[in-house]
């Protein structure tokens, strides 16, 4: 092989190395720690969610945190925290060995825990790991106190993950010790060594209260109109069961199971007060509503069997048990619809006072959106109803005999609006993902971004080109209506580029180098081809050209003759 061919091969290898380096750089930019976790969260609509939560205790107290109590998210978030908590304490086992019944890991997924009637705490430990931090003893004390106080009221069991660590991680146990409450609906809530005893105690009190009402009507107390108004003003989320004298014990049994699912999120009340029923415009009983920041969300099913279907109730309340604008966590994402847009509020937590105020503002924006959307949908329903009546009049004018039958076949043209969920995230935790995806300074003022997770499009400005900040809620609402095409108006002028293109643009500094390498390789490859072959084709071309020229001259001379 000639020297020129070897040079061509070397230049091609050099070009391949440069291209591979640029591609790896782009992959590293996409899969940064924060970006990978948040991408899993937004894609959870269709992908697997990482088994970790956001630790709000390390950031700031959220709005109405005092009222939420056990609704605080106190789970482990970072690798550093996991490393600190991946310990086991002999004191914990000695002090609480009498309160916890050791069970095998296989029993976790058995019918025992999947049964509707079994519930209680399960302590996950790892006997192979030794204590590493002195604070662990204090953290374990809260677990020990809980088991001593409620050992005769709540079931306590223990699982050693030493022999099945991977299986424990699959069910979301990433730190030890972890105390998990399994309710009788198959759901679980994880508490770690970060969780204070007060939070554990409040959670256990609610469980004990439910246990004491077995066989009785639950909820036991009936609220009246004044109490209902106080709850609307003070409770961010609560559920209300409206009934009359016709309710049976079976109805309240399903409510008791439903209440266990709501433990730690929202309380459940009941009423037969006609004033409350009239206030909520309810015409058929029994009826179940969720009140979120004063706005009622009704359970659409009205039949008695549907009201007793616990799993159907749990599915309906999966997202309604959170505040109107919750923090985006894996638990929230699991309950989102796959076709739902996301209105993400990027909250800057550097100032605790400003952050709390921003979260309150986000809740107000979510409330305005809900009320405005209901107003628009009411108009859409009235328009659809008018179209149906026009169709009925048209049938009568044509003289059809079976007008009622034909009208029944014509379905009411109900509006099919796109869904959107308002959430907020901590811009400090996700600063890398925010800066790479949206090209927004995460440490800047808090702002809004509308996102379509299915196509990975986003909108960060209004139709006038103004950024979507929390100061102007009207711009946020107007842009949301435009993006969802609910009001029929056009999209914002500042349309964002696809997320995939955003990632590709991160390697634009390598584009000139890649182009130069391509041109050099192409020139060298052509120049070092077999010279004999090039000369052969060149001589053959010259010979053909001469032949054609002679033929042209002879033909022209013959024409002259």
From Swiss-Prot:
It comes from the Eukaryota. InterPro entries: ER_Co-chaperone, Thioredoxin-like_sf. GO terms for molecular function: protein disulfide isomerase activity. Residues 25-509 are lumenal. Keywords: Endoplasmic reticulum, Golgi apparatus, Membrane, Signal, Transmembrane, Transmembrane helix. Residues 531-561 are cytoplasmic. The chain crosses the membrane at residues 510-530. One of its GO terms (cellular component) is Golgi apparatus. This is Uncharacterized protein C1840.08c. It comes from Schizosaccharomyces pombe (strain 972 / ATCC 24843).
């Amino acid at each position: 092989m000639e020297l020129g061919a070897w040079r061509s091969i070397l230049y091609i290898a050099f070009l391949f190395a440069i291209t591979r380096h640029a591609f790896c750089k782009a992959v590293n930019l996409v899969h940064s720690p924060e970006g990978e976790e948040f991408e899993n969260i937004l894609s959870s609509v269709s992908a697997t969610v990482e088994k970790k939560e956001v630790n709000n205790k390390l950031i700031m107290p959220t709005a109405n945190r005092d009222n939420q109590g056990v609704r605080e998210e106190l789970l482990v978030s970072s690798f550093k925290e996991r490393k600190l908590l991946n310990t086991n304490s002999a004191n914990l086992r000695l002090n609480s060995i009498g309160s916890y019944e050791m069970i095998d890991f296989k029993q976790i997924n058995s019918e025992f825990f999947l049964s509707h009637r079994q519930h209680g705490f399960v302590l996950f430990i790892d006997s192979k790991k030794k204590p590493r931090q002195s604070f662990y003893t204090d953290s374990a004390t809260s677990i020990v106190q809980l088991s001593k106080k409620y050992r005769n009221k709540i079931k306590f069991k223990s699982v050693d993950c030493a022999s099945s660590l991977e299986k424990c991680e699959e069910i979301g146990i990433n730190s030890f010790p972890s105390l998990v409450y399994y309710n009788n609906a198959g759901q679980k809530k994880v508490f770690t060594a970060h969780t204070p005893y007060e939070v554990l105690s409040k959670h256990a009190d609610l469980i004990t209260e439910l246990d004491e009402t077995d066989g009785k009507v639950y909820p036991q107390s009936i609220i009246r109109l004044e109490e209902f108004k106080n709850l609307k003003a003070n409770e961010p989320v609560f559920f209300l069961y409206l009934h009359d004298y016709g309710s049976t014990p079976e109805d309240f049994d399903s409510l008791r199971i439903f209440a266990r699912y709501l433990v730690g999120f929202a309380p459940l009340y009941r009423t037969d007060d006609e004033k409350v029923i009239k206030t909520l415009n309810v015409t058929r009983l029994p009826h179940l509503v969720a009140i979120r920041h004063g706005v009622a969300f009704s359970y659409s099913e009205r039949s008695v069997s549907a009201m007793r279907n616990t799993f159907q109730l749990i599915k309906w309340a999966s997202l309604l048990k959170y505040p109107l604008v919750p923090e985006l966590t894996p638990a929230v994402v699991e309950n989102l619809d796959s076709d739902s847009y996301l209105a993400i509020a990027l909250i800057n937590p550097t100032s605790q006072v400003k952050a709390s105020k921003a979260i309150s503002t986000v809740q107000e924006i979510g409330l305005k959106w809900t009320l405005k959307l209901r107003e628009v949908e009411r108009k859409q329903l009235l328009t659809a109803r008018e179209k149906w009546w026009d169709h009925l009049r048209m049938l009568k004018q044509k003289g059809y005999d079976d007008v009622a039958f034909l009208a029944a076949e014509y379905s009411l043209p109900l509006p099919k609006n796109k869904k959107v969920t308002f959430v907020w995230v901590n811009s400090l935790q996700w600063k890398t993902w925010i800066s790479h995806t949206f090209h927004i300074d995460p440490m800047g003022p808090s702002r809004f971004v509308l996102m379509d997770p299915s196509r990975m499009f986003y909108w960060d400005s209004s139709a006038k080109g103004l950024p979507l900040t929390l100061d102007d809620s009207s711009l946020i609402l107007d842009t949301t209506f435009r993006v969802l095409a609910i009001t029929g108006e056009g999209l914002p002028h500042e349309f964002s580029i696809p997320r995939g293109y955003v990632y590709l643009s991160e390697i634009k500094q390598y584009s000139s180098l890649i182009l130069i390498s391509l041109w050099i390789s192409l020139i060298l490859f052509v120049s070092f081809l077999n010279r004999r072959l090039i000369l052969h084709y060149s001589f053959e071309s010259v010979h053909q050209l001469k032949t054609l020229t002679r033929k042209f001259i002879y033909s022209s001379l013959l024409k002259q003759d």
